[in-house]
Every structure is written in structure tokens, then in C-alpha cells.
């Protein structure tokens, strides 16, 4: 903000916008380590669920994991060949791998919410995901929300330390939609 309280970070000139250009997507294997120089490595660990190709990044030098958004399952878009990765089940499977490596992680930075939290939050989230997988309808809260002009029922399973995993019954399991 400037001295008059205006948010100067929302002001920009058209010349500030980077023009679009074609680029090549280069896939990386699970566990790929980016060498940032001087032996400083950051490892990509799949942590899908919120988005189909999401990774967490483990900073091996500082023992910090940057998880991105892991607060729920993302939308499954029709025709998306990776839609099954936007499920609670996928997040649950990937989170098991991350939690098995807690001895390498001292702190985590999620995509939003609390910052610089202890790695124990990963264990607490896995506990919440376990509860969802056992009984998706037994949520801590259920409410109707409007998304893109459509009503949907949103479920939430609380995570110890003050947040929740949000989902709906159509994006819990990978292969077959959840049916009552």
C-alpha cells in the first residue's frame, strides 16, 4: 500500500503483461530432484488430489516441504484424462507416501492458510483422509454451496490444528463415483 492506502500491487501497465508464447511441457519422474546449484536440491513428490498433476516440493537442505493446496479434492472436468487424480482417494494415497517420510521433514508451507506449520499437520491430514475413506458421509460438517452457478453439497472433515479437508461425494473415490 502507498501512503494513501491504495493497493499499488493491483496497478499495472499493459506493457507489464508478459505475452503468451508456446512452450513445451516436460514431464518429470516421481522423486525428481532439481539441483539449484551448490548441491542444494529440491525433490518433487506427487501430491495429487486438489489438482491432477500437483507435486509437493521437499527442500532437502532446510527439511521443509511446500505442499500447495491439499485442503480437498479438485473438480473432475469431463474429458480430462487425468480426472481420477482429482479425488480424495488419490490425495490419501499420495499423503501416505509423504507421511512415511516425516523423519525428513521439519516444517511445511501449505498453499494457503497457516504458514510455517510443523510437519505433524501432514499426519493430522492423513488421519482426516483416513476417516473420509472409511465413511465419506460421516463428515464433521455438511453444507450446500453454489459453485459456477450450480448448487452442490460440500462435506468437510476437520483436521486437528484448525482446518478441514473439503470434498463432495462424487470426488472421493477414483474409479467409481460414490453412490448411496
Segments from the language model and where they lie:
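Flexible, acidic/histidine-containing loops and adjacent segments that form or flank the divalent-metal
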Residues: 24, 30-32, 36, 89, ...
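Polar low-complexity intrinsically disordered regions
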Residues: 2-11, 59, 84, 180
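Active-site HxH/HxHxD metal-binding segment of metal-dependent hydrolases
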Residues: 1-37, 127, 131-135
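Accessory terminal helices/loops
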Residues: 93-180
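Intrinsically disordered, low-complexity segments enriched in small/polar residues
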Residues: 7, 18-21, 38, 55, ...
